[in-house]
Amino acid sequence: MVYRRRRSRSADGTYTRRRRSSGYRRRPGRPRTYRRSRSATRRSGYRRRRY
């Protein structure tokens, strides 16, 4: 539903472009931190446990 509405608003161009940029930048930043933090914890725990 959100995607459909966003695509429909493409006529504006400005709102879609600005919102898309913010979403794209925020999307990679959030998951990257979570993934990195989880990876580091998992690796550290696995290594420490194995060691």
Swiss-Prot record:
Phosphoprotein is among the record's keywords: yes
Region (2 X 6 AA repeats of R-R-R-R-S-S): 5-22
Keyword terms: DNA-binding, Late protein, Phosphoprotein, Repeat, Viral nucleoprotein, Virion
Renumbered ranges of Sequence repeats: 5-10, 17-22
Post-translational modification: Probably phosphorylated in infected cells.
Any one GO CC term of the record: viral nucleocapsid
Region (Disordered): 1-51
Subcellular location per the Swiss-Prot or TrEMBL entry: Virion
Molecular function terms, GO-annotated: DNA binding
Domain of life, source organism: Viruses
Annotated function: Thought to be responsible for DNA condensation during packaging of the nucleocapsids.
Name listed for the protein in its UniProt record: DNA-binding protein
Gene source species: Orgyia pseudotsugata multicapsid polyhedrosis virus
Name of the gene: P6.5
